[in-house]
Amino acid sequence: MKNIHYYIVTLVVLLFMVAPAKAASEAEFGKLHKTYILHTDGSQEMRVQKELTLFTHTAMNRLYGESFIVYNPEFQELKIHESYTRQKDGNIVKTPENAFVEVLPSAAADAPAYNGLKEMVVVHTGLELGATIYLDYSVITLPGYLPELDVCEQIEELTPIREYVLSVSVPENKPLHYELLSGKTVPVVKTAGGVKTVTWALKNVQPRPNMIQVSLPAGNVQAIVASTYASKADALKVIKRQFESNDKEVSELAKKLTANAQSPEQKMKQLTAYVQGLGNCRLSLSQTGYRLRPAAEVIRSAYGTEAEKAALLAALQQASGIQAEVKAVFPKTEDKDAAGLAAVSRLFVTDNAIADMQDFVSVVNMDAQPVVLETVSHVISQTDTLRVTAKTGKTLEAGYRRFELPQAQSGWAVYEGRSTTMNTTRPVNLLLRYLPDETYTCIVKVVDGMKPVVLPTDKKIDNPVGTVEVTVKKTAKEIKIVRTLKLKKQLITPAEYPAYYRLMSEWMDTGKSVLFFNLSSAVL
């Protein structure tokens, strides 16, 4: 008995020892400072200073063993002010010259037009558990390369940040729009020596979840946006003026691609398929300096950035007599002009996924006018017939036969319902891609005198997130089983998540329903 008591006490102690370790972070930023400066001559500087302490081998070998800096050496200069590692015993290991490795950014691979870009890989040396990485660098941009100072910085990292500071400095006569998204920290604004500086300082920033998708539209991460564009319309003019109209090569291609099309819908489908078939260059707008190549060059090279392909698709459709325009997706802001081009998450012509999410983002045309997108119906109404006979189904003992309700080949349960309920609780908001409205009816035809033994039962769960309902109606020769799912809330908070989880658990269970019939009185 004493031995049992000893083992129980030992187990409890071990559990208390393991629990905190399991919850510990891989690393911690002691300091993460970012500074953006616009000088009077139009040149810009972005400076990053970070101190990062490593706690695990994962942090050391996978997450933070290297730092990556993308820049354009034709217009930008990279300056490494400081790079070293302070080991646990205080020993300093400076980053050697051969640990600064310059490569082509992976996003520019197979895109010769952007092969001038560079990515500096800083390989941190002297790493060990408890070591702290120190890195301080600047990217200095020549006047004229970037149209304006334009900032969009997500704050949360995969590890905690004890001290986060972001400051923006511009000549005091320049317009400056700025905003903190999904946060409450008020910036400090100072003007001295003809320079206006806006600074946000945050303490003890909690990490974003590692295995859970987070986003600005869901409101579960903070971000700072700032720009010196006079307005959002002025920002979009930078993109719009690069669009071409009546390009001969575009017109000829549009005519060729739609030669056999019988309707505008067929034309749109064929043009869209062509553009989607072009190679994808994953560089962002900011990485290309907010520049787009001419449509003719995109055609000849057979690849393009997202922005270039959107511009080409709009041009092809316009050349085919179809009304089309490029649209931009921004985060929602209280100051409509706070978000500049750095905050654009998508440029597109048509996109059903964005249409489903448009209540949580700002969608505008190239004149910065709000656009309401047409949505695609997600209503599913499916009817199947299941024949129950003395010879169908799976034979069981004692004269029973087992039947399974037909499984949905599409719909919420196939992927979304499972991928959004991996855990019973959720620490951050969940933004669903769309609101499902699904009804599955199964008509069970009963012959040969088969008698039902086990059937689904009537059930209805109705909560603030949505409704799951199952109804069963029996007659002499058939049974009608109706399963219904209808969600009401697209943005689900952590407090509402248990209600969503319960609905999904029930919905998954109804989708796997089995029926049992007895053969004892059946005609064999």
Question: What do the PLM-derived regions correspond to, one by one?
Answer:
Residues 9-17:
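Bacterial N-terminal signal peptides
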Residues 23-524:
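A sensor for short, sequence-defined functional sites
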